[in-house]
């Protein structure tokens, strides 16, 4: 939790790119490694490609995301699912 008087943290290079695009009325994808940056209202409507450690995941920013971190929307781990064999064994066991 960050102090209220400090304000939200956002890397300066990300903020500069967003402000520049807002001034030009452009909507381009911004590639960033800054998962720690907080989403601010100026980012709404933009798409940021956030690095997950392997590749860039496109994140379209909506109003509901304001106040969250960019890294929350670019998952670093992929859930492959439980094995089908284990799921069928537990379903086939009779209840005691």
Curated annotation (Swiss-Prot):
GO terms for biological process: ribosomal small subunit assembly; translation. InterPro entries: Ribosomal_uS19 (IPR002222), Ribosomal_uS19_bac-type (IPR005732), Ribosomal_uS19_CS (IPR020934), Ribosomal_uS19_SF (IPR023575). Pfam families: Ribosomal_S19. GO terms for molecular function: rRNA binding; structural constituent of ribosome. Gene3D superfamilies: 30s Ribosomal Protein S19, Chain A. Belongs to the universal ribosomal protein uS19 family. This is Small ribosomal subunit protein uS19. The lineage of its organism: Bacteria, Pseudomonadati, Acidobacteriota, Terriglobia, Terriglobales.
